[in-house]
């Protein structure tokens, strides 16, 4: 009589035995196909049972962990008598390994929660008792830090120490500032930055000293003009540069230029276009091969600067002029604001090609820059009228379109331009007049800004003083502690007020700025 073999499995966790059905083929005879299939099914069922048992053990362990996680901090905060998870507790016999692991994990979470609670009592961050699950949202309210990055005292001290380490003179603040803009440096033309600077012993190249003085005195203004002047000065610096012995040009020249940029920043903050030009120049310098001769490498760098000026500024202005020409019709009344070299070039090109239109030039104090635009248009024969910004709302009913320049185009589509631009765009929207912004793509930056408070530039407050004969309004204003003068340079226009941005790549909406930035970064 054949004896049937019984497969017995003893579970190490629970001590239970599971008996399976008699296994055929135990006498040594060859198993049939049906018996093999049946044996295979039995093995699958065994694996399935093992997985189910492990799943129940894991669920039990997580439930215990969650329960102890909720109760644990309260027990620890209650008093020293309730000690959870100490070595004095005896582990009851007959528990599985999974349960022991879950209990140990719960004890660790409780101890961690107690430590966090103690830190919270001492003024630290609020305790996080348990890690939240995937579907839960944190119930605690996140608070803003006491200082943002722009007015953080430690960051400001670090920025002040940096020019000192580079042996760069620092400009002192002038007068009292409005509290909203206390984190921005206050510039004054009365405080000379180079008064006690000795040119032979200074680390700053004379070309950079001359450029910084031109920036601070307002002799070179405008994003394009400032960027071109910077690149020409860098060409002179590269021409006079000599690589020290046991040094590489690609490394030493980058470090050599850092104090120069710090000095220019002390004279006047760099524009977004200048930052992009410096970034590309540093990339060109670091890409110089060490096997090249010094003269060859320097000539290549100067050629790269010439190529950048031609492609990004000169040719870009010509392409923008062709696109903007399509938007100008005969009989148009075009309103422009301030002094934009690009807008002035577009209007003169359109007039030279035969378009008949009239220009309304809007200006604002204290710089009155639009007078330069007015002179260039009158010199080219373009009919133009001139007024100040408070009277702009009276002429907008007869204006057909507004043509504006830009200091920078931010990643969120906002336009950073001369202060007063946002006001004009808002009044134009109220009169249903389209607003067109002309801007080269090298002015696009990855910075995001929705207002003019976080990052801006404060010009000399003495420019606001109005001189009428011998009488000067607001004279000796520094002696009045309750009086503060604010001379903002830029404002931020939201993208909702701009209908179109004309670039060398074509006419795009403000929302396409991130796309252009992405394409430019991939090309580089």
UniProtKB/Swiss-Prot annotation:
Keywords of this entry: Acetylation, Cytoplasm, Initiation factor, Phosphoprotein, Protein biosynthesis
Q: Which residues carry this modification: N-acetylalanine?
A: 2
- UniProt-annotated location(s): Cytoplasm, Cytosol
InterPro entries of this UniProt entry? IF-2B-related (IPR000649), IF_2B-like_C (IPR042529), NagB/RpiA_transferase-like (IPR037171)
Q: Which residues carry this modification: Phosphoserine?
A: 12
Q: How is its activity regulated?
A: Activated by the chemical integrated stress response (ISR) inhibitor ISRIB which stimulates guanine nucleotide exchange factor activity for both phosphorylated and unphosphorylated eIF2.
Primary location class: cytoplasm
Q: Where is this region: May bind the chemical integrated stress response (ISR) inhibitor ISRIB?
A: 171-180
**Which stretches does UniProt call biased (Basic residues)?**
41-51
What GO biological process terms are annotated to this protein in UniProt?
Answer: cytoplasmic translational initiation; myelination; oligodendrocyte development; ovarian follicle development; T cell receptor signaling pathway; translational initiation
Report whether Phosphoprotein shows up as a keyword of the record: yes
Q: Name one GO cellular component term.
A: cytoplasm
The segment annotated Disordered runs over 1-173
Which residues, renumbered to this chain, carry the PTM Phosphothreonine?
Answer: 86
What would be an example GO MF term here?
A: guanyl-nucleotide exchange factor activity
Which Gene3D superfamilies does this chain map to?
Translation initiation factor eif-2b, domain 2 (3.40.50.10470)
Function summary: Acts as a component of the translation initiation factor 2B (eIF2B) complex, which catalyzes the exchange of GDP for GTP on eukaryotic initiation factor 2 (eIF2) gamma subunit. Its guanine nucleotide exchange factor activity is repressed when bound to eIF2 complex phosphorylated on the alpha subunit, thereby limiting the amount of methionyl-initiator methionine tRNA available to the ribosome and consequently global translation is repressed.
Subunit (UniProt): Component of the translation initiation factor 2B (eIF2B) complex which is a heterodecamer of two sets of five different subunits: alpha, beta, gamma, delta and epsilon. Subunits alpha, beta and delta comprise a regulatory subcomplex and subunits epsilon and gamma comprise a catalytic subcomplex. Within the complex, the hexameric regulatory complex resides at the center, with the two heterodimeric catalytic subcomplexes bound on opposite sides.
User: Know the name of this protein?
Assistant: Translation initiation factor eIF2B subunit delta
What gene, per UniProt, encodes this protein? Answer: EIF2B4
